[in-house]
A protein has these predicted regions:
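Short metal-binding segments enriched for Cys and/or His
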Residues: 100-110
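Short cysteine-rich clusters marking metal-coordination/redox-active sites
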Residues: 74-77, 90-93
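Acidic pyrophosphate-coordinating catalytic loop
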Residues: 37-38, 70-74
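Short functional micro-motifs and their immediate structural scaffolds
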Residues: 82, 95-99
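Flexible glycine-/small-residue-rich
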Residues: 33, 67, 110
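Short, flexible, mixed-charge glycine/proline-rich loop motifs
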Residues: 62-70, 79-84
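Cys/His-enriched microdomains
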Residues: 72, 88, 106
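Long, charged N-terminal interaction/targeting segments
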Residues: 1-64
Length: 114
C-alpha cells in the first residue's frame, strides 16, 4: 500500500518543479522502479489516475514506468548476478557474502512538459 505514498511524493515533487520552472502543464512523468522495491507497478498506475485529477499541472499527464533490474554483488568472488533468479546466495561461488547493488530504488527519471 506504499504505492499511494509514493505517488503523492512524486506528484508533490513534480508540481514543485513545475512552479519553479514556470511550466503550464506536464505531459508525462517517467519513473524507474526497482524490481525488488516492493512497489507494484499496476498499483502505481491506478493511484496515479486517481491522484492526478486533484493536481494543477498533472491532470492530463501520463505515467511511464520502467523497471530497474535487481543485481547483487558477491564480495567473495567479485561477480554480479540477477537477484531475482538467485536471491542472496552467489551462483558462482555459493557465498552469502553478497549485497544488493540495484533494484530496490525508485527514481523520477524524466518529466516531460507541454
Amino acid at each position: 500500500m506504499h504505492e499511494l505514498g509514493t505517488i503523492h511524493y512524486v506528484i508533490d515533487t513534480v508540481e514543485k518543479l513545475a512552479v519553479e520552472n514556470q511550466l503550464s502543464k506536464i505531459a508525462s512523468v517517467t519513473l524507474e522502479v526497482g524490481e525488488v522495491s516492493g512497489i507494484i507497478p499496476h498499483f502505481l498506475s491506478d493511484y496515479w489516475e486517481y491522484a492526478k485529477k486533484k493536481t494543477t499541472y498533472l491532470q492530463e499527464a501520463e505515467l511511464k514506468i520502467e523497471t530497474i533490474h535487481a543485481v547483487t554483488y558477491c564480495q567473495s568472488c567479485g561477480k554480479t548476478y540477477p537477484t531475482v533468479q538467485y536471491a542472496k546466495i552467489c551462483p558462482y561461488c555459493q557465498s552469502d557474502n553478497t549485497f544488493l547493488v540495484t533494484g530496490n530504488e525508485y527514481v523520477i527519471k524524466e518529466i516531460e512538459a507541454m
